[in-house]
């Protein structure tokens, strides 16, 4: 997936479509799976309800 797919431009504002990893910080996105969000760098996982 290209970086351009992580953002949505609304006029002069930018909206992030993915969450950043809370452990790794800004610039490392969480992968959006069917039942969880996962960081590929550190392995952090959040399960969806």
Swiss-Prot record:
Annotated keywords: Metal-binding, Ribonucleoprotein, Ribosomal protein, Zinc, Zinc-finger
One Gene Ontology biological process: translation
Keyword tRNA processing: no
Keyword Thylakoid: no
Cofactor binding, note field: Binds 1 zinc ion per subunit.
Zn finger spans (C4-type): 21-42
Any one cellular-component term (Gene Ontology): ribosome
GO function term, MF aspect, one: zinc ion binding
Organism domain of life: Archaea
InterPro entries according to UniProt: Ribosomal_eS31 (IPR002906), Ribosomal_eS31_arc (IPR022845), Ribosomal_zn-bd (IPR011332)
Cofactor: Zn(2+)
Positions bound to Zn(2+): 21, 24, 39, 42
Family: Belongs to the eukaryotic ribosomal protein eS31 family.
HAMAP family reported in the protein's UniProt record: Ribosomal_eS31
Subunit structure: Part of the 30S ribosomal subunit.
Protein name, per record: Small ribosomal subunit protein eS31
Taxonomic source organism: Methanococcoides burtonii (strain DSM 6242 / NBRC 107633 / OCM 468 / ACE-M)
Encoding gene (name): rps27ae
């Amino acid at each position: 997936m290209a970086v351009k797919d992580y953002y949505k431009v609304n006029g002069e504002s930018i909206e992030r479509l993915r969450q950043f990893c809370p452990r790794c910080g800004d610039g490392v996105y969480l992968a959006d799976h069917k039942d969880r969000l996962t960081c590929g760098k550190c392995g952090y996982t959040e399960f969806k309800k």
